[in-house]
Amino acid sequence: MSELSEPRIPDAPAIQRLPLLQLILVGLQHVLLMYGGAIAVPLIIGQAAGLSREEIAFLINADLLVAGIATVVQSLGIGPMGIRMPVMMGASFAAVGSMVAMAGMPGIGLQGIFGATIAAGFFGMLIAPFMSKVVRFFPPLVTGTVITSIGLSLFPVAVNWAGGGSNAAQFGSPIYLAIAALVLGSILLIHRFMRGFWVNISVLIVMSLGYVLCGLIGMVDLSGMAEAPWLQIVTPLHFGMPQFHLAPILSMCLVVVIIFVESTGMFLALGKITGQEVTPHMLRRGLLCDAGASFFAGFFNTFTHSSFAQNIGLVQMTGVRCRSVTIVAGGLLIVLSLLPKAAFLVASIPAAVLGGAAIAMFGMVAATGIKILQEADIADRRNQLLVAVSIGMGLIPVVRPEFFAHLPLWMSPITHSGIAMATLSALTLNLLFNILGGHERAAENARHAHQH
């Protein structure tokens, strides 16, 4: 379908066009930002399953392939799937705890994980039309709270990167902090003194400079790149036929529900940033793509997929809101899945370089949520309490991940997700305070939102 034929919002930023070179450069920014998260899930599961280094590399390539295809479908819109907004897709962290446990279970392993992923994806496609109707329960009060929580829940990732990453021999070493500060400072200077396209690719510029600097001082690790093949084709069912077991399937179905909750908040955030109203029809298309990607992923040796919150901040900070950018980024992910040496090169970007950029971008996500909260009646004490409690609930797994360690394992997709905790809290309290609180309060809040 042609972008120009889209009748929904003819003047929306999401259907702007850019020259090809600009598309590639801005799309590359999206890939560099999400790459670490995209390969983390297959890396963790591969290690838990006791795979060899070559098999883990194959898992990573499979994930990049599915992430690229899902990103293209989500952004472009094919058939009934795809929200047609600048969305990046990748393996979801919501299922990591459950999948690590499955990997160690006798008789389950990777084949059981892939079977559960396929079944959960099919389940998600069945419930997506019903889940899409919850958009009416996301007024600015709830949306702003959720988006603020998304930004805050991402911040530990940025800080971890800036300190050198989880595997750093000396986390927080002055050299890591200096590199992160240099990257962050360079972004600020570009936004202060430059205009136009230079601002659009500010993250790519400073990450390239940071990479070169780290290379000069010996901080770029290219070990394993020489042994990696130039070309590798991802084949379906590489690890054998998927197996279907009830307990893993039920666990992964719960994960899909949590993914839908998280994705709803992310889609609404993108709608605010790009100036598009996210309708139930659009939300259904987006959730169908999430579920369809997970269904497809199980056959191609990878895991449940969802929209990546990290990239929302990049859309806001650079001001490039056209979905053609993420379509190109999806194509780049597909290329990386076929070229292991190129994938090694991208993976060699030092964590401190990513951290400096991520501090600004993840902060922009939280700032977007705060801006949306201005549209709500935030002077009302009950609404203030809703925001306070929901953000607090969202920060629990961020501040102390082990806080809910003694609860049943099946609850971990909820209790380990700050986004899910904040969203469920905000929805519940809004229902209690404003919807069940009487038509007068609901009408009053609606009038306040329309005034803005």
Question: How should each PLM-predicted stretch be described?
Answer:
Residues 58, 80-94, 136-145, 198-204, ...:
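Short, non-helical or kinked segments that cap or interrupt transmembrane helices
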Residues 175-178, 240-248, 278-286, 320-324, ...:
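Membrane-interfacial loop-to-helix junctions in multi-pass transporters
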